[in-house]
């Protein structure tokens, strides 16, 4: 498990999917979560909110996708440029939604995903409200 946001968020590595556990339920950003659920944004990974030992667990189904890090490692220069272009487009699309703070994106290349076949870039947005972030 890895800690993020000064230990207020922990990544859980228990399945093929990606999940995070909020150490304090008060940091959950309900407006951001609702914006995510109401958007038909092809670049946001769908977030599922569950309860886990009384804490909020955020689950993103990533098992069918490939990490951007793996895609970049296997791509030629044209493929790399295409993936970078798609990543920039995805970031701009999310930024234009409003209500979502770009600082709450898990920006590690191993946690940005590419959908096989379509090559759509999928991004994990963490709906959290932290001092200095929102």
Protein language model regions, located:
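A general structural signal for short secondary-structure junctions and capping/turn motifs
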Residues: 11-12, 98, 113
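Conserved structural core of kinase catalytic domains
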Residues: 2-84
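Hydrophobic residue at the +6 position relative to the catalytic HRD Asp in the kinase catalytic loop
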Residues: 105, 110-114
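Elongated alpha-helical scaffolds
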Residues: 82, 86-89, 113
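Structured beta-strand/turn binding interfaces of compact recognition modules in eukaryotic regulators
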Residues: 63, 110, 124-126
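Short, surface-exposed, polar/charged, turn-prone segments marking secondary-structure boundaries
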Residues: 49-50, 86-90, 133
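C-lobe/activation-segment region of protein kinase-like
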Residues: 102, 115-134
């Amino acid at each position: 498990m890895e800690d993020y946001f000064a230990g207020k968020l922990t990544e859980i590595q228990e399945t093929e999917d990606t999940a995070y556990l909020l150490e304090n339920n008060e940091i959950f950003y309900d407006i951001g979560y609702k914006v995510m659920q109401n958007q038909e944004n092809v670049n946001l990974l769908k977030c599922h909110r569950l309860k886990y030992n009384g804490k909020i667990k955020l689950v993103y189904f990533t098992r069918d996708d490939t990490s951007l890090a793996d895609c970049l490692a296997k791509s030629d220069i044209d493929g790399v440029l295409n993936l970078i272009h798609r990543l920039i487009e995805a970031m701009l699309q999310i930024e234009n939604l409003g209500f979502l703070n770009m600082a709450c994106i898990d920006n590690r290349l191993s946690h940005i995903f590419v959908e096989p076949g379509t090559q759509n870039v999928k991004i994990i947005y963490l709906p959290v409200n932290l001092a200095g972030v929102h």
